[in-house]
Amino acid sequence: MDPPARKEKTKVKESVSRVEKAKQKSAQQELKQRQRAEIYALNRVMTELEQQQFDEFCKQMQPPGE
């Protein structure tokens, strides 16, 4: 194989490698975004549950007749 053809093949490999890296980075960013959204959703649910339990506790602690 002559040197120009070898250079061209190397450029193609580098281009494919660049595209693969970009795809991996994009997939990683999407995963992080999805995980972050799931964490926020879970946090919201847990906060609501905690508030409900606190309200129930307050009701139980009030003396009857109030």
Curated annotation (Swiss-Prot):
Per the record, its GO cellular-component terms are: apical part of cell; cytoplasm; cytoskeleton; extracellular region
Q: What is the lineage of its organism?
A: Eukaryota, Metazoa, Chordata, Craniata, Vertebrata
For this chain, one GO molecular function annotation is:
microtubule binding
Q: What is the effect of changing residue 36 to E?
A: Decreased VASH1 tyrosine carboxypeptidase activity on alpha-tubulin
Q: Which GO terms describe its biological process?
A: axon development; negative regulation of endothelial cell migration; negative regulation of protein ubiquitination; protein secretion; proteolysis; regulation of metallopeptidase activity
UniProt keywords (A-Z) are: Coiled coil, Cytoplasm, Cytoskeleton, Disease variant, Intellectual disability, Secreted
Gene for this protein? SVBP
Q: Where does the UniProt annotation locate this protein?
A: Cytoplasm; Secreted; Cytoplasm, Cytoskeleton
Give the protein name, as stated in the record: Small vasohibin-binding protein
User: Which organism encodes this protein?
Assistant: Homo sapiens (Human)
Family of the protein in this entry: Belongs to the SVBP family.
* Effect upon mutating residue 43 to A: Decreased VASH1 tyrosine carboxypeptidase activity on alpha-tubulin
User: Can you state the subunit structure given in the record?
Assistant: Interacts with VASH1 and VASH2.
Locations of Basic and acidic residues compositional bias? 1-23
Which stretches does the entry tag as region Disordered?
A: 1-31
What the entry lists under InterPro entries is as follows: SVBP (IPR031378)
Residue ranges annotated as coiled coil are: 5-52
